[in-house]
Amino acid sequence: MMSFVQCGTWFLLTLLHPSLILAQQSNVDELGCNYLGQSYESRDVWKPEPCQICVCDSGSVLCDDIMCDDEPLDCPNPEIPFGECCAICPQPSTPAPVIPDGNRPQGPKGDPGPPGIPGRNGDPGLPGQPGLPGPPGSPGICESCPTGGQNYSPQFDSYDVKSGVGGMGGYPGPAGPPGPPGPPGSSGHPGSPGSPGYQGPPGEPGQAGPAGPPGPPGAIGPSGPAGKDGESGRPGRPGERGLPGPPGIKGPAGIPGFPGMKGHRGFDGRNGEKGETGAPGLKGENGLPGDNGAPGPMGPRGAPGERGRPGLPGAAGARGNDGARGSDGQPGPPGPPGTAGFPGSPGAKGEVGPAGSPGSNGSPGQRGEPGPQGHAGAQGPPGPPGNNGSPGGKGEMGPAGIPGAPGLLGARGPPGPAGANGAPGQRGPSGEPGKNGAKGEPGARGERGEAGSPGIPGPKGEDGKDGSPGEPGANGVPGNPGERGAPGFRGPAGPNGAPGEKGPAGERGGPGPAGPRGVAGEPGRDGTPGGPGIRGMPGSPGGPGNDGKPGPPGSQGESGRPGPPGPSGPRGQPGVMGFPGPKGNDGAPGKNGERGGPGGPGLPGPAGKNGETGPQGPPGPTGAPGDKGDAGPPGPQGLQGIPGTSGPPGENGKPGEPGPKGEAGAPGVPGGKGDSGAPGERGPPGTAGTPGLRGGAGPPGPEGGKGPAGPPGPPGTSGPPGLQGMPGERGGPGSPGPKGEKGEPGGAGADGVPGKDGPRGPAGPIGPPGPAGQPGDKGEGGAPGLPGIAGPRGGPGERGEHGPPGPAGFPGAPGQNGEPGAKGERGAPGEKGEGGPPGAAGPPGGSGPAGPPGPQGVKGERGSPGGPGAAGFPGGRGLPGPPGNNGNPGPPGPSGAPGKDGPPGPAGNSGSPGNPGVAGPKGDAGQPGEKGPPGAQGPPGSPGPLGIAGLTGARGLAGPPGMPGPRGSPGPQGIKGESGKPGASGHNGERGPPGPQGLPGQPGTAGEPGRDGNPGSDGQPGRDGSPGGKGDRGENGSPGAPGAPGHPGPPGPVGPSGKNGDRGETGPAGPSGAPGPAGARGAPGPQGPRGDKGETGERGSNGIKGHRGFPGNPGPPGSPGAAGHQGAVGSPGPAGPRGPVGPHGPPGKDGSSGHPGPIGPPGPRGNRGERGSEGSPGHPGQPGPPGPPGAPGPCCGGGAAIAGVGGEKSGGFSPYYGDDPMDFKINTEEIMSSLKSVNGQIESLISPDGSRKNPARNCRDLKFCHPELKSGEYWVDPNQGCKMDAIKVFCNMETGETCINASPMTVPRKHWWTDAGAEKKHVWFGESMNGGFQFSYGNPDLPEDVLDVQLAFLRLLSSRASQNITYHCKNSIAYMDQANGNVKKSLKLMGSNEGEFKAEGNSKFTYTVLEDGCTKHTGEWSKTVFEYQTRKAMRLPIIDIAPYDIGGPDQEFGVDIGPVCFL
């Protein structure tokens, strides 16, 4: 039903005067309307709400409220249908009447139809029969139903309301009784539009409609002036961690680091492959094969023969019993160093076992460092003379070449041509086989002899001892980067960077939807004072702003805490040679290596300490006695030598006790020179001869050929450490020894090259540091350090086979001997030859009984030259290291196969002179052969196991900065870190250009600043900023992966010889011991007397020219060159892309107060002053001019009457007509007084004096106008209105501060708070405590709003503010908790803008403590003084205080509220 039906009466629409609301409109087109997002045609009528109806009128929306009749309905339960506004009586549930359309049941109730055509008033009729229900009508407009009808606006008359047409209304008739509801009528045809009704009077404003859609953007206004910088926003949360960036460009190689710790000993490597069989030698001339004769009877002892050529090595015999300790032999020349094995891990030190029998001699250890000067030993008895060595050919000394890099193993060279047969020598008489004589001193060095025929390959020797690690190699190509490490702990916040320049203004964005009201901004520049605004509601915080342009790089931050070490990256390339590392622990002895071939003679070592005098050995044939030469001075400490091959680990035996001294034997008679006899069996020991006179020093003789291996002698005492030998080729990896004790920490390795970024790891929360884990698996072996301190000297090894002597070359890798050459042709018969020439050499048999000496054969043709050995790694000369302790001798290894001849090495330094030897005949000088080709490179050994990670080394020198890598993709979002400590203030940025004018906003009322909002949501991660400046040197990082082993260092210098020991007493001859293993080769004795010149050897064929050697190792890094000249300034690079705005830096520190501004313009003219006091009388004036002529005198009798009437006496004449001057009393004093008063008032307006009558604006103005005033109380009127609201303040005339006291100024000291809760918390004094109050300031007699206004103006006039609060405590902590060492129990202060000031956190909101006496509970009263200073004057004064450590029965406090001072 329509609402006018519900009201019960039809009213003429002409009487309705509705109040229409013109809603916000938007011209959709010329006729249509847009309302709340819906489009309507012109003249459409709709109901946005049940009690509101709207119509579209040519683009304008007119809406009105539907008012219902207040009269009660005549039904028991009226109801409001859905979508309707007014209540109706419910329909009785009767069958649906027949309607014109046909028989159909009544449908659901339709919407109200539009109003029908109003008819004229008829006469009141009788109550009619109930009519049929009418069709539903649309809601009518009801404004004042209580008047008996509804107001329908005449404006609706002309609109299509989807139903009848409204006509002009008639006058209302009396209301008839309501009829029962009729049946629904059929819809009428649309009526034609009625004529427009009269315009109704405007209604009262309706309630504001909902906000319309935003209007189109206005034109851009002129640029406004830039506002002051707002307060810094809170920093956004860290952006998500970006994806790992692409790998950076490979940086340049870093400066070599220090060598790492000595690695653990690696496993023994597999045996190397057997070398190729050498080419067969040239066939020699056929000799007459002789059968081996049966051993004849032992002949008489012949004169000692010449030293025979070395025989083939015999098979290793069974170990003989340990013989008695022999006398110390001369130290042999250092053997070639074995290949460097991986250092073994040191084994646990075993307990000292029982003294074992001395083991057979091990293979010779490498030369140790010179030991310290020992005490002189007793002079030992001279040994019996040895057999004369066969003279060697004297070689010419070649210049020492620069050590080449290791050459590849060359192919076996072809056999050289056969030499011509030598002339047969004269046969000497056969002598008895002489006893083995003691070794004679070496004779003068002979010329180089011919090479012997190749021997049968000997058995493969055991692996040599591990060599010392070579020097580090050059830095390799940087390895691939390791995987990305886990995020480190958050470091402390660095200092704030300088603020960046203001970026250019961005393009104007479209207007966004209205955001929430932002927090009130900081005060702008001083404007003209406005009237007090209405207090607004605090706004909610605005959303985060767009990212701005990145600022310039910040100042250098402090070093962050070191992050946890990342995972080891892949192994990098070998680094450049590092500095020498400290000595590592001795490794456990490795397995005995196979016997190596003899190397070239090493550099002579200095003489070591004399050993203890051993028991005298059996005497040899009498030699020419020589005196022992003086020992040289001790040499400087050499570097650690390369470790020799170690034998299998044996238990350390205790050194044997020295045997009893034997008596000195008589010297034997030297025999004549005979042919070399076959080695006879060992005869009984002869008596020792008397020591011979010391012979003159001869030139050093050539080194004799190697004799057959004698039975092992007893182990000698440890000799002095020899010099460092040349490093040999690298051996295969040895088997792992037992784990040794932890070595000393090595030097720091070089900084590794940064690896590529690893794949993106998931961001995990940073956990607390865990306990130290178990040691991890062994890492890869670190780069070997420089040679450490010499290890204990090994026992003397068996003497290796002697190669053909040549100039000392780099030791080659031992090659296999070539096959024996074919028999040579038969030589010319020698004189007096008893036996035939010897047959081809058979395999070595066991030692048979000594046969009779055979005749000397004809000298065979020169054998083919053997293949050259591989070039060894050149060792660098190391720095001298401290001497090592002598080690226990190891057991001897089995004999190794002889090596191929190595190329000649550089000449060694002169050794200390040996005992004089018997002079040998001098040979003619032979031509030196050319250097043989280098041998082929051996197969690489298998890698050893990873060693245990070394301790962190000292930090290496910083490498040069790498090239900048390409930009990485953003990492994943990190966990939000704790707030950083406040950084130092940044510099003020330059003022940016004014931005474009924004859309004009509606003027809002100034709200009080709200409390700090919650932090905004995280901004999008910014793009990478430009790189910052170089940071301070960080703490040591975790050690990088060890580099590959470097090349060996150069050999160290030769140390000086040791001093001569005292001569020992001659011991008695001991019984013959069982033959002992051969002792280590002694050091060269002093130079013997010059031997006779040997026969001229045949000229050897020229050797094949060797391959070109590899380039030498890179030298150590040179010292930095002088700085180059300053380069020209480069052209400026192109501008980079605009980066995002960095996070807001913290506000800078409060700047110093500015200079006083200029004096303002004169104020407006003041009011008229009060009337001044009357001035003093002036001086008499000058006489006036003569007056006009007087009136005619009396005449004719009538004058008396005239005179009586108008004469002066009667007062009838005006004084103007008299002769006396006028008395004009001009009060000059009054005028001057008024001027002075006006002038004073103007002066007091321009320069107020701070009195109640002339208050100043603030104390700073007062100080500028009246600098002579002293500090004290004055009146100020900051709002410059009526002076009646001036306030009394304290002016500090030294600073210009305006200080306002609190009222009251103290909080009494007592127990204010009882806390029943278990947890303590901050409790605000004014908000929560019983009897508490918030602090007020100023004169309490003035109204509170007056003080608020004056304070507000005072804040606007001030650039900074400060205030002190004194907290008196009794058993209450105010700031620092002495027991816990933190400030968690410190007070909070609340500022006037409801901001909180704390002890720690954002520096803008932290107070300082001037005195802290409340650090513990003492039961006594004490105090803590807080101070807060800020450049944001709106934050002060402090209005409340919140203690934390209160609530206990014995906890009391009070407060002194200091004045708040504005400047």
UniProtKB/Swiss-Prot annotation:
Residues 31-90 form the VWFC domain. The keyword Transferase does not apply. It comes from the Eukaryota. Belongs to the fibrillar collagen family. Residues 174-184, 709-718, 889-906, 1045-1054, 1180-1192 have a biased composition (Pro residues). Residues 1229-1463 form the Fibrillar collagen NC1 domain. Residues 155-169 are annotated as: Nonhelical region (N-terminal). Residues 97-1195 are annotated as: Disordered. Trimers of identical alpha 1(III) chains. The chains are linked to each other by interchain disulfide bonds. Trimers are also cross-linked via hydroxylysines. Interacts with ADGRG1. It holds the Pfam family VWC. Residues 164-173, 389-398, 527-548, 668-677, 692-708, 835-849, 863-879 have a biased composition (Gly residues). It is found in: Secreted, Extracellular space, Extracellular matrix. Residues 170-1195 are annotated as: Triple-helical region. Collagen type III occurs in most soft connective tissues along with type I collagen. Involved in regulation of cortical development. Is the major ligand of ADGRG1 in the developing brain and binding to ADGRG1 inhibits neuronal migration and activates the RhoA pathway by coupling ADGRG1 to GNA13 and possibly GNA12. The C-terminal propeptide, also known as COLFI domain, have crucial roles in tissue growth and repair by controlling both the intracellular assembly of procollagen molecules and the extracellular assembly of collagen fibrils. It binds a calcium ion which is essential for its function. GO terms for biological process: aorta development; aorta smooth muscle tissue morphogenesis; basement membrane organization; blood vessel development; cartilage development; cell-matrix adhesion; cellular response to amino acid stimulus; cerebral cortex development. Ca(2+) binds at residues 1277, 1279-1280, 1282, 1285. Glycans are attached at residue 262. Residues 228-240, 265-276, 822-834 have a biased composition (Basic and acidic residues). One of its GO terms (molecular function) is metal ion binding. The gene is Col3a1. O-glycosylated. The modification 5-hydroxylysine is found at residues 262, 283, 859, 976, 1093, 1105. This is Collagen alpha-1(III) chain. Keywords: Calcium, Collagen, Disulfide bond, Extracellular matrix, Glycoprotein, Hydroxylation, Metal-binding, Repeat, Secreted, Signal. Residues 24-154, 1219-1463 form a propeptide. It comes from Rattus norvegicus.
